[in-house]
Each structure stands twice: as C-alpha cells, then as structure tokens.
Amino acid sequence: MKRGAGRLLSLLIHPLLIGLLVVPGSGVLAGPTVSVSPTTQSTRLLAVPPAPKAVAELPVTTLITPSAFDTLQADLQAIAAQSGAQVGISLQELSGPRRNNLSLNGRQSFYAASAYKVPLLMAEAQQVASGQASPSERLCFDPRDAEDGWFTDYGDGSCFTRDELAVRAGRYSDNTAAHILVRYLGGPDALNRFAKSFGMKASALWDPNTTTADDLTAAWVNEALGRLGGTTAQRWLYPVLSHTAYEHGIPAGLPGSATVVHKVGAMYGTENDSAYVVNGRISYVLSVSVDGIDEAAGWSVIARISARIWQYELSRPEFVVPVIPPEAPRQPETRY
C-alpha cells in the first residue's frame, strides 16, 4: 500500500516538474542557451545605408553674344583700318532709350581747316539770340581779312550784313567772310574763349588751328540741347548750315529725309565733317576727321561711317520695354 501510494505521488509530481522546466524565461532548462544582448548604438549605425555619392556637375558653357552697339564699334574700327588713314570718330546719341556715346580716336588732334567756323557761327547765333548782335548789322571788309574762297567780290569799302556773311561762311565755307566775322567777334582769342567755354578744351583754333572729333561733338551737343542761345539761336544758325555746297561727307551716308546741320573742313590732306542729324524720332551728333589719304577717298570714308551709324540708329528700339518680375505666389491663409 505504501509502495502504491509512493508511485502515485511520483506520477503526480513528475508532470509538474516538467512544466516548470519548460516555462519560458525561467532559465531553469539545462543545456546550451542563446542570450541576445540589446542592440548597441554602433550596430544601428552600421545598419544605415551609406549616403549616395555626389554626382559631379557638368560644366556650363555661357555664350555671350555681342550687342548691336559692340558690332557697330567693331565695324567702324574695320572701316577706319581698311582706309589706311588716321580716323577720328565721335558719336553722341540724343534720342532712344539709352543714349550711348562712342569715341574712336576721338581725342586725336587733327588740322581743323574750316571746322573752326562751327564755334564761330555758334557764337554769332548766341549773340543774335541775346540781342548783342543784329542780323542786319553791316560789317565791312578789311584787306587783312582776304583769303581765297568761294566769293571774290570783296574790296575796299565793301560791307555785308551779318546774315550775308554767315551764309557765305556757313553754307559756302567762304574764308574771307569768316575772317570778317572773327574780327568783329573780338579776334582769335575771343573765338577760343567761347569754344572752350562749352567743352572744346583740346582745340587750338585759328593758330595752329587744330581740333578733335570729341571737341566738335561737344559743340554740336551743346547747341542741339539749347545751351548756346536756345531755339532763337537755332532758328538763325540751322538754315545757314543746311543744304550746303559740300554734302559729300556725313549727308552722303543718310537718307534724303534726314535733316543734317553740319560743317565741313578740308585742307592739307585732312577732311572733317561734324553734324547734328535728325530724322523722325532719331537724333544724334556725329563728328569724323580723316587724315593721310586723298580728299575724294577721305570723303568716301566719312560717308561710309555715316551710313553704318545710320543703319545702327534705324534698328534701335524706340522705347525701353520694362522688365516686370512675376508676382510671388500668395501663401494660403492660416485659419485658427
């Protein structure tokens, strides 16, 4: 009986022991065990995939296209170089959205020849406009004024109105008429003082009678802007220097519709022409001096330069197109 009871007790206890041995996490089960330690920081870093390698940017080629003004300058330089002459060019735009100026050898000194008559006639116009001088005042010839020129009717006691002498000196570039006007103005010193007062600082007029393209342009710009007597002076001056006897320089490169107020000069292998040009909405001042080639070739160079500049001016826009940045997108309203 005792033996049977012991066996019964053994049968009851054995399953309980087995249950205890297989309880998860009890650690009682004998034999090899696998211990999983917590994941460390270094292990996690190794698990992160490496950042993609930066792809090298391809080089960007920027193409810079020359502007129309750059092309104009290059073309004028080519015309001057091909001529074989010394060439001075001075351009100042008086119209358009961007009033450019151009000077190629503009400060180089050239023999002025009759170009001194530009400031001379401007001085006369200013005096007429201010009332200091009368267009009908009679000015008389002095034998010391004589120089070969267009007219030959000067003699002792001959007198001419200021208007008559201005037309002779301007439209026909007559030398004796210009000498009479210089004398009544106050002589060469007075002429040079007047010229320097509005920017002709590199010129030595009359003697040795030199000037530059930039100086001649300065004279015309001041006249065109009304700084030398205003519209009254212009109304007196412009007809005197329009449709002259010498139109084979700057006017020859322009359309017949253009108004060209200008004055030429030529002597000792030098040709000068300086002008105020107006045609519709376009206006500008151009001065060109050429030295070192024969006279006919010199005028041809001036005409070619004039024509190329006109071609450029004709293609310029009439106004500036404003660049308006696009409006920034509006942010959605935040509702609370």
Briefly describe each language-model feature range.
Residues 60-73, 143-146, 154-232, 240:
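Active-site-adjacent helix/loop patches that line small-molecule binding or acyl-intermediate pockets
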Residues 122-130, 218-225, 307-311:
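Short glycine/serine- and small hydrophobic-enriched flexible loop segments
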Residues 110-141, 286:
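Active-site SXXK
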